[in-house]
Amino acid sequence: MDFMGYKPRFLDTEMLCQRLRECGALGVKSVMFAGEGEPLLHRDIAHIAETAKSAGIDVSFTTNGVLLKEDLAAHLLSVTSWIKVSCNAGTPESYSAIHRTQAEDFERVMDNMAHAAALRARERLACTLGFQCVLLPENVEGLPELARRARELGADYLVVKPYTRNPKSLASNYDDIHYNKYRNLAERLADEERKDFRVIFRNGAMRRWDLRQSAFERCLALPFWVYVDAGANVWGCFRHLGEESFRYGNIMEASFSDIWQGERCRSNMKYCAEEIDVSQCHVTCRMELINIYLWRLRHPEAHDNFI
């Protein structure tokens, strides 16, 4: 998230583990390590993941995969529900251009995921391994190759999803992209599917991006999630990072229970459920499908009671 600045900051391990144990006792179901930076850069990430799992919390990662080396994978796979690698290209050259990194990192990622898949099979672990790719004009032709590589190295799936942009983002390169012309790509990618490998082409999300229309009028999803940034701040929404009214508190300064049950959290959720203008939110946000479902529950349409 470029608008937050790429700051070399890390959550304190002891504090984070304490908060994870609190979250487990409170009934938090899952945690995904991802966000403004690369989660595997944290030197204690294996211990943190193990702590979350032992607290009864399901663990997942979204990562670029460059640091998912064999020794780290051996610790993570046994306590993790799924690991998803963000890879927006099918060749080293396009990977280097799109990710703004060395071309060698592409093969490093592929090797790391292959080792992880082999480890999973050898140890009979249950961790799901997959790739996700943002569909861009620059990577369209390389996606069949990416699907093939992912399948052959032992991944379970490849997700192809639309570009989305937080309104605060400093970059606007793809704001005018339209996905209607890429619909036939789904059929090409389906050729790579097998019994144990799926290509998930997010047609619905692409249509919603093209139409820029929302099927709900308020945000009802906030009681079901929070985002904790690397500065330990607890936020209600990606769209409003940096806005004080959406900052519930800081886990360095208060327990998660005190923050979650605090007045700032309650008042913000009430505002979002009753007043917020979702037309100012970004299309295909993480909470979009949850909001569509919850809005329909609150505002049923004709014949919804029939199976």
Predicted feature locations:
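Radical SAM enzyme [4Fe-4S]-AdoMet core and its adjacent flexible, acidic
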Residues: 2-14, 21, 25, 55-60, ...
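Active-site-adjacent substrate/metal-binding segments within catalytic domains
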Residues: 16, 20, 31-32
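Glycine-rich beta-strand-to-loop/alpha-helix junction loops that act as flexible
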Residues: 32-37, 64
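Short, well-ordered alpha-helical microsegments
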Residues: 42, 68-70, 140-143
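Aromatic-lined substrate-binding rim segments of carbohydrate-active enzymes
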Residues: 43-58
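Membrane-interface junctions of multi-pass transporters
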Residues: 213, 240-288
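Terminal, non-catalytic domain-edge segments
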Residues: 291-307
